[in-house]
From Swiss-Prot:
Its EC number is 1.1.1.37. Keywords: Cytoplasm, NAD, Oxidoreductase, Tricarboxylic acid cycle. Pfam families: Ldh_1_C (PF02866), Ldh_1_N (PF00056). GO terms for biological process: malate metabolic process; tricarboxylic acid cycle. The gene is MDH. Homodimer. The lineage of its organism: Eukaryota, Viridiplantae, Streptophyta, Embryophyta, Tracheophyta. GO terms for molecular function: L-malate dehydrogenase (NAD+) activity. It comes from the Eukaryota. This is Malate dehydrogenase, cytoplasmic. SUPFAM superfamilies: LDH C-terminal domain-like, NAD(P)-binding Rossmann-fold domains.
Length: 332
């Protein structure tokens, strides 16, 4: 029995992240080695020629799983029948720009894309927002696509989650696949809280707490947190371009685990619509630890939160509430 292809939308597809992401999707890294895909690529009219170049390369790569490519500058055409939407397109902050100006540009982009998805996407479409400010862009999308269930709209904090795993694995000189259950709480910004209080490392077949193995609270409570929070800026400084390869890879991880499930005993971080869990204000998109099964995520409940964690979780929530207010002020 042939597997029906899934339609995957990538917006901003001619950009850096898009260029890294589309071959990963076409190779089956996002949805699995047996799942055929039809790629829908959207970008703005000035990027139309570059977008066509990406389409040519996708044809040239002869990916067995790639059953078709739609490359367009028309949002309605791009969204038609898509099962998964990865929203990479947005308005980047340029030097000298006020936060409100950037927010205003992104609010109008995400309002328009929300209505295109609302009208044209497949009924159970899963949406992942990557473009910054990711949490608030996802919130705007949710507001203006009321027929898409709120549980189907998420934002990317898996990049931060993976960055945290990477830092622990480097510090302890262990395989990154043996580190699990870090948490990114809050905003995909420098206020995010990378929490290792529940994280473990597998050593000689046994899961041991990261805190115990690292045995350096000063590092875990200080440099580790700031390194993860500021990793994006460090990569821009080194590469003169933003992190594209790691962003694309973590977007694949996010969708892969959401659709195909997380391993037993492992959670991941996803920016999802808050229901008030862990006393986080409802009505914002906030990164929580989640497990996934049968295409649905569930917030991991009942983790003990110490006073220091509480303060950091509240600070990043406050920033998200403030961003929400700013975004809504751009709507009037």
């Amino acid at each position: 029995m042939a597997v029906e292809p899934l339609r995957v939308l990538v917006t901003g597809a001619a950009g850096q992240i898009g260029y890294a992401l589309v071959p990963m999707i076409a190779r089956g890294i996002m949805l699995g080695a047996n799942q055929p895909v039809i790629l829908h690529m959207l970008d703005i009219p000035p990027a139309a020629e570059a977008l066509n170049g990406v389409k040519m390369e996708l044809v040239d790569a002869a990916f067995p799983l790639l059953k078709g490519v739609v490359a367009t500058t028309d949002a309605a055409e791009a969204c038609k029948g898509v099962n998964v939407a990865v929203m990479v397109g947005g308005f980047p902050r340029k030097e000298g720009m006020e936060r409100k100006d950037v927010m205003s540009k992104n609010v109008s982009i995400y309002k328009a894309q929300a209505s295109a998805l609302e009208q044209h996407a497949a009924p159970n479409c899963k949406v992942l927002v990557v473009a910054n400010p990711a949490n608030t862009n996802a919130l705007i999308l949710k507001e203006f696509a009321p027929s898409i269930p709120e549980k189907n709209i998420s934002c990317l904090t898996r990049l931060d989650h993976n960055r945290a795993l990477g830092q622990i694995s480097e510090r302890l000189n262990v395989q990154v696949s043996d580190v699990k259950n870090v948490i990114i709480w809050g905003n995909h910004s420098s206020t995010q809280y990378p929490d290792v209080n529940h994280a473990t490392v597998k050593t000689q077949g046994v899961d041991k707490p990261v805190r115990e193995l690292v045995a350096d609270d000063a590092w875990l409570n200080g440099e580790f947190i700031t390194t993860v929070q500021q990793r994006g800026a460090a990569i821009i400084k080194a590469r003169k371009l933003s992190s594209a390869l790691s962003a694309a890879s973590s977007a694949c991880d996010h969708i892969h685990d959401w659709v195909l499930g997380t391993p037993e005993g492992t959670w991941v971080s996803m920016g999802v619509y808050s229901d008030g869990s862990y006393n986080v204000p409802a009505g914002i998109i906030y990164s929580f630890p989640v497990t996934c099964k049968n295409g649905e995520w569930t917030i991991v409940q009942g983790l003990p939160i110490d006073d220091d964690s509480r303060k950091k979780m509240d600070a990043t929530a406050a920033e998200l509430v403030e961003e929400k207010t700013l975004a809504y002020s751009c709507l009037t």
